[in-house]
Amino acid sequence: MSLSKYFNPIPDASVTFDGATVQLEESLGAVQNDEESASEFKNVGHLEISDITFRANEGEVVLVLGNPTSALFKGLFHGHKHLKYSPEGSIRFKDNEYKQFASKCPHQIIYNNEQDIHFPYLTVEQTIDFALSCKFHIPKQERIEMRDELLKEFGLSHVKKTYVGNDYVRGVSGGERKRISIIETFIANGSVYLWDNSTKGLDSATALEFLSITQKMAKATRSVNFVKISQASDKIVSKFDKILMLGDSFQVFYGTMEECLTHFHDTLQIKKNPNDCIIEYLTSILNFKFKETSNSIVGLDTPSVVSEENQALNINNETDLHTLWIQSPYYKHWKAITSKTVQECTRKDVNPDDISPIFSIPLKTQLKTCTVRAFERIIGDRNYLISQFVSVVVQSLVIGSLFYNIPLTTIGSFSRGSLTFFSILFFTFLSLADMPASFQRQPVVRKHVQLHFYYNWVETLATNFFDCCSKFILVVIFTIILYFLAHLQYNAARFFIFLLFLSVYNFCMVSLFALTALIAPTLSMANLLAGILLLAIAMYASYVIYMKDMHPWFIWIAYLNPAMFAMEAILSNELFNLKLDCHESIIPRGEYYDNISFSHKACAWQGATLGNDYVRGRDYLKSGLKYTYHHVWRNFGIIIGFLCFFLFCSLLAAEYITPLFTRENLLRWNNYLKRYCPFLNSQKKNNKSAITNNDGVCTPKTPIANFSTSSSSVPSVSHQYDTDYNIKHPDETVNNHTKESVAMETQKHVISWKNINYTIGDKKLINDASGYISSGLTALMGESGAGKTTLLNVLSQRTESGVVTGELLIDGQPLTNIDAFRRSIGFVQQQDVHLELLTVRESLEISCVLRGDGDRDYLGVVSNLLRLPSEKLVADLSPTQRKLLSIGVELVTKPSLLLFLDEPTSGLDAEAALTIVQFLKKLSMQGQAILCTIHQPSKSVISYFDNIYLLKRGGECVYFGSLPNACDYFVAHDRRLTFDREMDNPADFVIDVVGSGSTNIPMDDAEKPTSSKIDEPVSYHKQSDSINWAELWQSSPEKVRVADDLLLLEEEARKSGVDFTTSVWSPPSYMEQIKLITKRQYICTKRDMTYVFAKYALNAGAGLFIGFSFWRTKHNINGLQDAIFLCFMMLCVSSPLINQVQDKALQSKEVYIAREARSNTYHWTVLLIAQTIVELPLAISSSTLFFLCCYFCCGFETSARVAGVFYLNYILFSMYYLSFGLWLLYSAPDLQTAAVFVAFLYSFTASFCGVMQPYSLFPRFWTFMYRVSPYTYFIETFVSLLLHDREVNCSTSEMVPSQPVMGQTCGQFMKPFIDEFGGKLHINNTYTVCAYCMYTVGDDFLAQENMSYHHRWRNFGFEWVFVCFNIAAMFVGFYLTYIKKIWPSVIDGIKKCIPSMRRSKTSHNPNEQSV
């Protein structure tokens, strides 16, 4: 099918710059200011590019080179916000002023960067289906055909049922994920496309296909495309119609590629190195490297490329290049065209013909599409789905059985109130657990909104709608189980009203916490807001504090609380028509009073009337709780109003507030904090181990040339190198041996693998692979998805699942010491996973000390090599710098056996890529064995590799040997192939030959005419399709020679008699590991000021809120009840605090799982211990703040005997919730599941502590849980400390009136009862009405609640036991989850039990698996 017919761009599109001087915010670009120290504040910088003049027409693809490219692209993308240019110049889209056009038609400007952000639990086809549904209002069948065609074009048909995945969720490979991003961008259907390093992670063949498709799409849809590429072969460069070259301050060229080369090479006489590809040549001009001699070009001893003519032109700086550009005929040509275009443009407003609807589908379809995707997300994330379902079912069973068969008595009415309150509170906690998922959705939603797939508020509305639907199912399950176990009224009306209000209240909480997530910039701040909201909801639901007892300054909160209205409606619905038996509450009672008329007794329950041994439910509601049944449907309307209000505010926040929380805005805010709050500055200006030079690069105080260690450091590949020890080009010989002592003393070993097969399920990813590495630099190459990363993981012993067969040998001997092997190798992952709040130097130092020899001086060498600003935070690094840091983290370990690198040059510009490969070459020349996957290598880059190991799709080896011989090998076996050593890139040649082609686009040259369609199926190198290169290699003489060479090398290695384990660096002691990781975690925590502020603010705010709510607690019966609920609310604060702790600890956990664990950086228990040690002082100090804010407001005793012991126990409680939160985080597969576990286990343990249900009413089966719940002991200790020896003076309404029999005083009449049950009389000697108070002192109340002051130290010991249990469970949970990896087995077991979850069609494709 032809795809072009579905695209409707603006006709005659063009982008014209006429002498425009553009000012751009530097933070918008990918380029970071390396000279800026992270310890110093600077305002957001601005890039100013002067005199930009060019015109790009419809159907053209323009290559843009230069440091400011990313900033320019983002400026054009956010044209109406961030693009500023001088009035003397002009920027036009057609005849429209660009900023006006960008404001009126933002959907016509499409931006794609190097980041691949997707929902990991959606499959590839679901992701593309969604994008197509948002942009094309066509029948479903056409959309499916269009999807399949796109997947076919981009070579993704074989993974369409596979999860997309991310760095932490296994899914498609990185290259395949990049292609998904490209497809999404194409689907956006714009007129101007800005491709910002969009080929990062693609091999050269796939990148060429991408450019071919872009070129065809540009011509078919008549769009304008601007492309930034860091590395590209000449064949790729030839695909571009024009090239725009930007210096830091000026434009230096625009025109065709042929004109560009003529201008610089022929006219300006800037010579080109024969091994450099075009993009390397042009990049060197922009970076002004053509003025440098061989001594300043890292590792090269080639002659100077500066000609006499060039020197005569006196090109000394960028201004000279710009001057020569404007003097050229090319500039005059384009200046005439752009001036004419601007002169003809007299329109002040945007042409109405160019304005089209921003969104391609109606709102109804947007809502439907987003809702369907929400359903697919939740079904895909099975861990989260199952954890929610299990928690609701188990919780309803447990609580239903706890309140089993509630009696129709006055005491039973309290249980009914507790059950109602618990139901409301449980679903509040469950809604709170959704906040982490809300934050994880936001980056993907932000990308889609920028692509104009839908309105931001539509996604919010759809997500809320689906969450409400899914929660409704949970509420129905919960209600059915709980309602009938508790034996609430068996009446259809009562049941459905209970279900209705619990459901609507739950919807309200879903919207409220969704709103909280949308208005908070970070999850820590969201947890702060949610913590305060949670307290307000719980305390002012009119159950913890009755309406009549609320202080007047806070009673208004109850009327703003949906829980209060839900509580009144549900409890009124249950009690209004009941008659509650009062036999357990009659005063006086006992054998002495059995024969006395009831006219002398009274029912001690609110709402009781004299002479009746029962209480009507409606009377209890009215007098005790201030409830009335007549408010039920009024409250329903009010809750619906709250729901609509929260939902409306969520939609507004999604549209206008959340978009403000971009990285750029948050960096600005962080800069303001640094400027006005110097104490927040996290960097040290003085460092004992390193100093900073003018370039912001860490250099040791000792000169590099003087480094001398037992294993000598590799000299820096910077200008500070000794000129008498240089890397020669591979074609040259190294004839200087005077500096051999400087080289790393690496004993040569032979690492070989034979008949390696790797299978996951029924899919074979590596098929009978054999090879070896002894020394030198070997490139592991193949098309995207061929299994390169998988083979690296197998060889480095990093596979986590599947079956590996075959042999891995060291010097011909089977590998037995895997731990030593892992410590002898380095592995640079494709994903750049680091702790964001460490500096570059700190990141390198940790790796050096834990995995290397601890040579801190060597850190300066690596920093100089990689040109990294040592004192800059990782969070402030550009993507390129993060990649360099990943390499540096492995280099500082000095791997003695083998260094693996997975695409180390991906995303780097040509110069940086060449620098890295040159350094790798230097290491290999010193004996280091290096195996490196590489994408898109230029001819000069690939020439540094000694050998290549070539894979085809399916993980089959098709060649192993030197690269020149590889080209000869393929040509010799297929005479129809041709290879020109002078012109062709050998890397591109071998990939083209063995690659089956990711798409069906022909690999034609730029000169070949291109069709206006993008669907002509022509395969790669048709002439080679009939050859099975894998089978040919297995029987080839070349493989026999490889085997013979391996035997000789192994024999030499065995003769040396050196065991590779002798060169393994001894790891630091266990205590040293703990010390170093604890210091690291402390630094990361200290620098996260948002987290620290949120923790202290939540404790202070919650303490004051609770303290003022229970202000000066009275010495009456209500005061006793208030004391219990005060302590219960103090424990409730732990829930949002746990969420904060988990969010913070997640960062280091993910880094450990993704990188450090696989590299044996330190023992897994070290991370858990270090995180606990670092969090402990924060928990204690913040809990101290809470205690000070709360305790002294409530009016309890302030002596050390009471307040001191209370404080001691609360500090222990802070240790409990800290260890509890870390246990669940380290035992759960992800943060969302951990949040559900917190909600479930918190409500589970809290329900058995005797607050919700009195111990006397516990079913016998559950009495053990009363003893097992840690909250039982905390509550008993806290309440007994507050109420011990506290005098009770009942208020008039709390006095129980009774009438003595004739001839007796009240004291005489009530004495038997008081002797048995306690209490006191207001007046003993009266003969009329006896005013009885149930308690004399607080200990009487404690005894009734099964509590005792004398248990406080016993409880203190039990509390320590629970803390120790949490810590032990944390270790066990982490071991089972991440060492033994039990979760996949658990999920598989559940899938077998639930047939609907058996999704065989959605299998994973771990060709190049993520963690």
From Swiss-Prot:
It is a multi-pass membrane protein. Residues 2-388, 440-471, 516-524, 658-1090, 1139-1175, 1226-1230, 1377-1411 are cytoplasmic. SUPFAM superfamilies: P-loop containing nucleoside triphosphate hydrolases. ATP binds at residues 782-789. Keywords: ATP-binding, Glycoprotein, Membrane, Nucleotide-binding, Repeat, Transmembrane, Transmembrane helix, Transport. GO terms for cellular component: cell periphery; plasma membrane. It is found in: Membrane. The keyword Flavoprotein does not apply. The chain crosses the membrane at residues 389-409, 419-439, 472-492, 495-515, 525-545, 637-657, 1091-1111, 1118-1138, 1176-1196, 1205-1225, 1231-1251, 1356-1376. Disulfide bonds: none annotated. Residues 31-273, 751-979 form the ABC transporter domain. Gene3D superfamilies: P-loop containing nucleotide triphosphate hydrolases (3.40.50.300). Transporter involved in the uptake of sterol. Belongs to the ABC transporter superfamily. ABCG family. PDR (TC 3.A.1.205) subfamily. This is ATP-dependent permease PDR11. The lineage of its organism: Eukaryota, Fungi, Dikarya, Ascomycota, Saccharomycotina.
